[in-house]
């Protein structure tokens, strides 16, 4: 039997019909171990216009640096109160906000160490395939040796860094395209 791959489709205006029940803007509960963080931002296109129908899918390790996934074989503890996953829709102004915990460092390839980060998939109208990026935390000492950040040109790394404001809320925006400040997206 020969199987044919299913084609990709844009998210379209109706994703909310089948996906809103999966929306979770608070990835950590009161019992989750780790430092609580809030991340807020906005999704805009290359002209700076609001993208008001985007959705962010967030994946991350727990505070010990372990993913709640069977392929993560690190000898680190799982947190029974943390799944490390959430879907976050934007509002009419393209804004989003979610709360979670700051993840621990994660083992990378060939014994390297990845800095604390969140993996973010961006879904939006007009995208045939979702976009993959990461959120790192500004000022995190482990950033200097992160193997993926080292591959990003120095002048573009800022697009991956969430910056804390005066209240301690991290700010991070998604710019879908353009020559000025486009968010770094990764192939996979």
PLM region spans:
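Beta-strand-dominated extracellular/periplasmic modules and repeats
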Residues: 1-188
